[in-house]
């Protein structure tokens, strides 16, 4: 959160736009832990020097937008920006352009636009670390099959073997082989 010497942050953008079309882990965090995300975001915003806070969420997530708008309504420093559903909207440079209308120049860092971008999951992790004294040892992962018959979110410890992810999602057959729907994705 410390910008390079000579660069100053004007905005903290919390990225609530999933980077891939079938991911839903950020959406679930925003609908289930919105208050914690906002508290973690507020901590980061203040560390950056009381900059403006923006939460970018794709418009195909109306429940998350509604929840976050309701929460931020009491904070003058925060704004929720609904974003067009466009791949890869969750990319850092694309998000800055969509939210601020500023392009990150080639061979430059995002801070050159005055923006610091953090994921909503990072804001949640900051809350957990500072308020609950919990280290970041888990992450939420979406497991989705190509035919979308399986689409679930799981919280796993960092370093968990991929076979355990797939087994938990029901992607393995009785012999321990990957099911056909998942074989296309993995």
Residue locations for each model-derived region?
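Hydrophobic alpha-helical hairpins/lids featuring a short glycine-rich hinge
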Residues: 1-14
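Hydrophobic alpha-helical positions that pack around
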Residues: 2-4, 50-162, 168-178
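Gly-rich Lys/Arg/Thr-decorated short loops/hinges at beta-loop-alpha junctions or inter-strand turns
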Residues: 12-26, 147
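Mid-sequence acidic-hydrophobic segments that form the walls
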Residues: 15, 44-47, 71
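Short alpha-helix boundary/capping segments
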Residues: 25-36, 157
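Metallocofactor- and cofactor-centric catalytic cores in central/energy metabolism, strongly enriched
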Residues: 26-31, 47-50, 56
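Histidine-anchored nucleotide/phosphate-binding helix
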Residues: 31-47
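Beta-strand/loop-dominated core regions that host nucleotide or nucleotide-derived cofactor-binding catalytic loops
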Residues: 181-185
């Amino acid at each position: 959160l410390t910008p390079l010497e000579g660069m100053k942050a004007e905005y903290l953008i919390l990225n609530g736009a999933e980077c891939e079309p079938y991911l839903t882990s950020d959406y679930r965090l925003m609908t289930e832990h919105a208050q914690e995300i906002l508290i973690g975001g507020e901590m980061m915003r203040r560390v950056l020097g009381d900059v403006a806070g923006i939460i970018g969420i794709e418009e195909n997530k109306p429940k998350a937008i509604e929840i976050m708008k309701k929460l931020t309504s009491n904070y003058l420093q925060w704004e929720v920006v609904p974003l067009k559903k466009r791949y890869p909207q969750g990319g850092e440079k694309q998000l800055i352009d969509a939210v601020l209308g500023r392009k990150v120049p080639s061979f430059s860092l995002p801070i050159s636009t005055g923006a610091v971008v953090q994921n909503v999951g990072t804001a949640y992790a900051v809350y957990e670390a500072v308020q609950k004294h919990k280290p970041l040892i888990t992450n939420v992962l979406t497991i989705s099959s190509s035919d979308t018959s399986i689409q679930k979110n799981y919280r796993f410890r960092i370093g968990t073997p991929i076979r355990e992810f797939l087994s938990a999602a029901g992607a393995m057959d009785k012999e321990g082989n990957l099911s056909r729907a998942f074989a296309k994705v993995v």
